[in-house]
Every structure is written in C-alpha cells, then in structure tokens.
Design a protein with these regions (language model features):
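A generic fold-level signal
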Residues: 32, 135-137, 153
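Conserved catalytic cores of phosphodiester-cleaving nucleases, focusing on short active-site segments
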Residues: 114, 140-152, 157-163
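Extended, Lys/Arg-enriched charged tracts that mediate electrostatic binding to polyanionic substrates
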Residues: 101, 105-138, 144-147
Length: 167
C-alpha cells in the first residue's frame, strides 16, 4: 500500500474485540472483492459485550470529533474528557440509536470497520456529516480515504457506505 496522506483515528484495540471468521465464500463479482466476516468473543455460549463497550468508549470521541477539534481539546488539556464530550454531543443531536442522527451503533461500527479493516482513514463520520451546517439528511454512513496505490505511485479513492432500508 502507498503511504497514507491521512492518519487513522481509531484506537488499535480492534483485534481484541472482533475475531475474523474464516470462510471460503466469495461474492462472484468481476471486480476484485473480499468478503470479511467478524464476530465478538463468545464466553459460556454468549457474546461477551464488555470488550465492545470498552472499545467504543475509547473510540467514541474519534468518531464524533474532527481531527482539528480533537487537537483543540488536547491543546486545552481536555483529552481525558473526550469521550464524555462526545456522548454529550450525541445526546444533543438525537436520542441514542435514533435513525439518521449519526448516533446509531451500526454507524459507529461502520467507522471502526472502515478504519481498521480497510485501513481507510476517516474524513467525515456520519455524525460529522449530520451536524455540518445543521443539516440532518446525510445519506452516507461516512466518508473515508482508501489507499489503492503502490509505493512510489500513491493513488486514493473516496469510500462511502450507503445503506438502503427496505421495510
């Protein structure tokens, strides 16, 4: 992979929370593709959610705040309160899990998977899109920068995730 022009924001504890499921399945598409499946750790026949909760607490601020906002918080000595400030912002935007506000668990997990699995740094999270300019109509779950070039020949693609809810 080519050198990254943008660093990833995700705390690198991903592999302690999610385990990749090995399989032989493919999507049978013409273009290069990968199908990756992950699951949480299982203890006594039940999912262990504690590591997931801790992982999300550690990364919530990175999802909610832009890099510039995070830098401002660190410079002001507020780096220990980033997660609390992130929770407060999410609550202001809408009820936890409310569709379209950027506070749904799936939207936050999308950010985590894009950053870790694709190694595609966040440009804008769903939450940042939703709150930018006061608009609440973001159709993308996030915008990430994917490196597709080789060493010495950098190339990048913008990656969007858009989900269609069918009732």
């Amino acid at each position: 992979m080519a050198d990254q022009v943008l660093s990833r924001t995700l705390n690198q504890k991903f592999d302690t929370v999610f385990e990749e499921v090995t399989h032989q399945e493919t999507l049978n598409l013409l273009n290069r593709n990968d199908l990756k499946l992950f699951c949480l750790d299982i203890e006594t026949n039940q999912f262990n959610y504690d590591p997931l909760v801790e992982f999300l607490e550690d990364n919530l601020g990175m999802y909610v705040f832009s890099r510039a906002e995070l830098d401002e918080l660190v410079d002001a000595g507020k780096d220990r309160t980033v997660a609390l400030k992130a929770v407060r912002r999410l609550i202001k935007t809408g009820n936890p899990g409310e569709k379209g506000t950027g506070s749904e668990l799936g939207e936050i997990l999308d950010y985590c998977f894009f950053e870790h699995v694709l190694e595609a740094p966040k440009i804008l999270s769903k939450y940042e899109q939703v709150t930018a300019g006061g608009t609440y109509k973001a159709q993308s779950e996030g915008v990430h920068l994917l490196s597709v070039g080789k060493a010495g020949a950098p190339a990048y693609q913008l990656v969007y995730l858009s989900l269609i809810h069918i009732s």
